[in-house]
Structure formats: structure tokens, C-alpha cells
């Protein structure tokens, strides 16, 4: 990218931008919620569209001069609908959390009961955590994973639904490595007369590539981010049935947000177009292939995977048998250039600031070009770094850099 002007006008920030590029280039990015956006997406984010205020929706703005950005938003909405087979799309949410909030405000009243996945079992803050707005404004009841299989037990979900009679059931997760059966969730919702919202932020790319069953035919509302497996800009997306469109849209604007970020909406449109290309399906297939292989290689080295494997882009590693916490593993591996995040595991005994596990994803490294054969080396570096954590780690840092040199970023 061309940084001619910022390098001249603000060298302090420019230096940090270059430093971050160096960090990304020389490190292996395994955070499951991160990816590498294309230069086309980034060009849209840095475009002249950032100058335009456009409160409202296409054809009904509160500012003049919106006829160009109206076209941008229309394209983004139509591409999102085409990509996921949805009746309606709202591309204005600034984040996934705001997308979830908008759905809640569309169909819930303060204090209504909602059934969502427990954060410590793989859910998300906005699925009812008591420290989040969702847990403060609504009466969330949590479901988790089975103690033995570490997968969702739909019979237990049904029992909880019948007992608590939630107005809404939230399906979806931030750290769950198995296929989610949206049809079963729909059946449970129909049995008790509840709405179904699916948060597919993590698996949106897999859904687009038809590598995970789509929630769209079953859910009343589907929310997502656009920057994880979709490889787009940081932002949110909501899909819904047409009958909810009007109420949903007014809960985004004027309910929660003012002016939409038109440069980000343009970048969303670009990423939707990229995801509609046949090459995107090939990319997502490689993401899953790499994740499965990395998981298998870690198991060979004595690591315990939650649910014993993966069906998607991430694995959750239980470190209880490795005599190291998630917090310490995250810090240790960062020292050699491998970035991942500490994560709670089912039946967690440690605090969320320490944790007994780590979450690993392969979306970003697959975008860079990492192949299945590289997963053995990554697993080996992770294992040996943890084993030899009290020794000099320079050799592992060099091995990471050698791998990264094979797959340059933005070159």
C-alpha cells in the first residue's frame, strides 16, 4: 500500500503501522477471529467514501448528496443476500456486538428470558455474559456442552427451553469446533414458540462456501461479523426474514447508530464479491483441511483437543495435561512469533483471565498460503516451545521466521 502522505505528515503513526506489518509478516497468526484482508478491501476502507455522512438508508437519507453512497450500500446489501440466500440484509452495523444488540432490541423487552450458550463453553459475551449489556438487560439462561462429548447436547437444550420458555434462543459460538445443527434449534424454538437468532460470526465464511450448513433457512435472524472467515473489513452484518426487515432497520438507525461508515460498507461489498468467487470455496476448504491437520499433529504430540477434533476453522486445546495455563502459553508462544489466545475450556476451573486452554484458528495462515504440510512444523514448534519454556527460545523464533519467509504478506 502507498503510505506516502502519512509517512510525511505523521511519522510516529507511520512507524507503528510499519512495525505492525513487520510483526504480521514475521509471525504465525493463529487467532481464530483474525484474517488477512485483501488490498482491494483495504483500498475501499481508505477511500473518499470516508468523507460522506449518510444517516438513514438508500433513498431515505437525512443528508443530501447521498446518491453515490446509496449505490454502494445497495450493492453491499444485494451481494450479502446473494451470498447467503437471505431475504433481507442490513450492512450498517459497526460490529458483531451491535448486530446482536439490534436483533435483541427488535424482538425483546427489558427482562425477557433468552437462552444462549455459556461463554465458558464456547459462547460469546453478547450471548448473556453478566458483564455484558446482554446479561444486564435480559434474563439469560445458559446452555453448554456435554461433559463427556464436549459437544452441544440438543436434548439438554430442549429441556432448558421447555423449563424456562425463553422468548429467544441464540445459537452460535466463538469457540466451538463442531457443526451446529440449526434445524434442531429451529425445532426446539417451534415447540415453545421462540424466535431463533444465529450468530455465525466465526463460521460465516464456511457457510458462504457451503462447508457448514446454513442457518438462513431456519433462523429468524442471522448475525455476523465480516472480518473473520469472510476476510473483509471489521464490521457487522444482519440477515433476516423480510417480515422483520422494517423493525430491524429502525433499531439500527435511529435506534442504535447514527451515520453508517460508508467506506466500511464499500469494503463489505468488496469482500462479499470476493466470497462469491469460486476460489473462495477452495480457500475455505484449505482452511478446514489445515485446521484438521494441525489438530491431528498436536494430538500426536500429546495435546488434548476439546471434543477430540474439529469440523471448522478452529480448535480448542485443553492444556491441563501440559502443566501450563492458557495465559502463560499465549505469552510464551508470542515470544517466538506464534499468536493465539488463551481460552476457557468446558468445566473450566481457572478464571477467564488465566484459563486452562488456548484457541487456535487457521484462517489467517491459509490466506497467506500456508499449506497442509506446514502444519506439522507449526505443531512441532508449539510443542517444543512449551516443553522447553525455561530454556533459550531463539531457535523456535528462527523456525517461525523461516516459515513466514515462504509466505510473504502484501508483496
From Swiss-Prot:
Its cofactor is pyridoxal 5'-phosphate. Pathway: One-carbon metabolism; tetrahydrofolate interconversion; Amino-acid biosynthesis; glycine biosynthesis; glycine from L-serine: step 1/1. Keywords: Amino-acid biosynthesis, Cytoplasm, One-carbon metabolism, Pyridoxal phosphate, Transferase. It is found in: Cytoplasm. SUPFAM superfamilies: PLP-dependent transferases. It catalyses: (6R)-5,10-methylene-5,6,7,8-tetrahydrofolate + glycine + H2O = (6S)-5,6,7,8-tetrahydrofolate + L-serine. One of its GO terms (biological process) is tetrahydrofolate interconversion. CDD domains: SHMT. Its EC number is 2.1.2.1. PANTHER family: SERINE HYDROXYMETHYLTRANSFERASE, SERINE HYDROXYMETHYLTRANSFERASE 1. HAMAP family: SHMT. Homodimer. This is Serine hydroxymethyltransferase. It comes from Clostridium botulinum (strain Eklund 17B / Type B). The gene is glyA.
Amino acid at each position: 500500500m502507498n503510505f506516502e502522505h502519512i509517512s510525511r505528515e505523521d511519522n510516529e503513526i507511520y512507524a507503528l503501522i510499519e512495525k505492525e506489518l513487520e510483526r504480521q509478516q514475521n509471525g504465525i497468526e493463529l487467532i481464530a477471529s483474525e484474517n488477512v484482508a485483501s488490498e482491494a478491501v483495504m483500498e475501499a476502507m481508505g477511500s473518499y467514501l470516508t468523507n460522506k455522512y449518510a444517516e438513514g438508508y438508500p433513498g431515505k437519507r437525512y443528508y443530501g448528496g447521498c446518491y453515490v453512497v446509496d449505490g454502494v450500500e445497495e450493492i453491499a446489501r444485494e451481494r450479502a443476500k446473494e451470498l447467503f440466500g437471505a431475504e433481507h440484509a442490513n450492512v450498517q452495523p459497526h460490529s458483531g456486538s451491535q448486530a446482536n444488540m439490534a436483533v435483541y432490541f427488535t424482538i425483546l423487552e427489558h427482562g425477557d428470558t433468552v437462552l444462549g450458550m455459556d461463554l465458558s463453553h464456547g459462547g460469546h459475551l453478547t450471548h448473556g455474559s453478566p458483564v455484558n449489556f446482554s446479561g444486564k438487560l435480559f434474563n439469560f439462561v445458559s446452555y453448554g456442552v456435554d461433559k463427556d462429548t464436549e459437544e452441544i447436547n440438543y436434548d439438554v437444550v430442549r429441556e432448558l427451553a421447555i423449563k424456562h420458555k425463553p422468548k429467544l434462543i441464540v445459537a452460535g459460538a466463538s469457540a466451538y469446533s463442531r457443526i451446529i445443527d440449526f434445524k434442531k434449534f429451529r425445532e426446539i424454538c417451534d415447540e415453545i414458540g421462540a424466535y431463533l437468532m444465529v450468530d455465525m460470526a466465526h463460521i460465516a465464511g464456511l457457510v458462504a462456501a457451503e462447508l457448514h450448513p446454513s442457518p438462513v433457512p431456519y433462523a429468524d435472524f442471522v448475525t455476523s461479523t465480516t472480518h473473520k472467515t469472510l476476510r473483509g473489513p471489521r464490521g457487522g452484518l444482519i440477515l433476516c426474514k423480510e417480515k422483520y426487515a422494517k423493525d430491524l432497520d429502525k433499531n439500527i438507525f435511529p435506534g442504535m447508530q447514527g451515520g453508517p461508515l460508508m467506506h466500511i460498507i464499500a469494503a463489505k461489498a468488496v469482500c462479499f464479491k470476493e466470497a462469491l468467487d469460486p476460489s473462495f470455496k477452495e480457500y475455505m476448504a484449505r482452511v478446514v483441511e489445515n485446521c484438521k491437520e494441525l489438530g491431528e499433529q498436536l494430538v500426536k504430540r500429546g495435546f488434548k483437543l476439546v471434543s477430540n477434533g474439529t469440523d471448522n476453522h478452529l480448535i480448542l486445546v485443553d492444556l491441563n495435561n501440559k502443566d501450563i495455563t492458557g495465559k502463560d502459553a499465549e505469552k510464551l508462544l508470542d515470544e517466538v512469533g506464534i499468536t493465539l489466545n488463551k481460552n476457557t475450556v468446558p468445566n473450566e476451573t481457572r478464571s477467564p483471565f488465566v484459563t486452562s486452554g488456548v484457541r487456535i484458528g487457521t484462517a489467517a495462515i491459509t490466506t497467506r498460503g500456508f499449506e497442509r504440510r506446514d502444519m506439522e512444523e507449526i505443531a512441532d514448534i508449539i510443542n517444543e516451545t512449551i516443553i522447553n519454556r525455561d530454556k533459550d527460545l531463539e531457535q523456535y523464533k528462527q523456525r517461525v521466521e523461516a516459515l513466514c519467509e515462504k509466505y510473504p504478506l502484501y508483496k
